[in-house]
Amino acid sequence: MPQVSLEGLRWYDFYGVELPFSAMAGPRDTRRGVAAGFAHDPLGALLASVNIGVRANAQWGPRIFTAVIRGQITGPGTAALLANCQASYDQASRSEGVTGGQPLGNADVAEEAFRWAAYTPAAAVIDLVSAGPGPQGTTVRASTRLQVVWDGGDWKVIAPPGGDWGNSAAELSSLSGYTLFSGQGGGR
């Protein structure tokens, strides 16, 4: 598996989620809520998986998730992912009184760690650990498998099976075997 240096990695706030970026590996463009312009190397693949995967979520509203899914997600589950995000957003926005396609609010989650499952210059498979608050002050962790492919001069994320990130995620009880992100973000 590739060795990537996390030295020089910096973090920026995306609606309460600290996301990693690198001056050398990207993202180089974060306009309009989309993160693009990743290096064609292992660090670029890792940063793309985190930045694109987080954005392909109903939480951020249709302006962001639609642009991300249509432009940066590929594979047979893409249409289902878009439909699932829209349905989740519609339901949550009604119950929370959010109007005009606005984001549903900040998220209380940290991107904590990763593990390589596979890497070639054409594709990579990365298990990404996210942590959030659980019952009684505990921290709950999940590992989500993200697949990226080099397509059209940038990394794209392959949609999860059935267009549901839950089909690619599993609860995690230990960070053994994972590489912790360092710096401002990545850690609860």
Per-region residue spans from a language model:
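Low-complexity, intrinsically disordered terminal/linker segments enriched in charged
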Residues: 2, 139, 159-188
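Surface-exposed, charged secondary-structure patches
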Residues: 93-133
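Short, cysteine-centered beta-strand-loop-beta hairpins and adjacent loop/turn segments enriched
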Residues: 132-141
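Hydrophobic/aromatic beta-strand elements that line small-molecule binding cavities or substrate pockets
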Residues: 113-116, 143-149
